[in-house]
Amino acid sequence: MATYAIVKTGGKQYKVAVGDLVKVEKIEGEPGTAVSLAPVLVVDGSDLTTDADKLAKISVTGEVVEHTKGPKIRIHKFKNKTGYHKRQGHRQKLTVLKVTGIK
């Protein structure tokens, strides 16, 4: 059975396993830098672990592969009868991580 963990980073939860490439909210660090993903919520290997005391001792490590941007999101604000309209765009900064270990 493959070991996986559910980690929380950037306000979102991700299910990761060793060797996975995951796009997460931007994390500081140059490509090749090792990072640790802190709150581990669940670990499943030979048995499912959800106990907070055991999870505090478990860490998920990864390596920064690259920094990239998400898709362009277009925002358009419009108010009727006043001639007011405003266009805006946004691209979220993302980091691609390769999960190297669940210990």
UniProtKB/Swiss-Prot annotation:
GO terms under biological process: translation
Database matches in PROSITE patterns: RIBOSOMAL_L21
Chain ranges passing through the membrane: none
Superkingdom to which the source organism belongs: Bacteria
Keywords, in A-Z order: Ribonucleoprotein, Ribosomal protein, RNA-binding, rRNA-binding
One GO cellular component term: ribonucleoprotein complex
GO molecular function: rRNA binding; structural constituent of ribosome
Family named by the database record: Belongs to the bacterial ribosomal protein bL21 family.
Assembly and binders: Part of the 50S ribosomal subunit. Contacts protein L20.
Protein name listed in UniProt: Large ribosomal subunit protein bL21
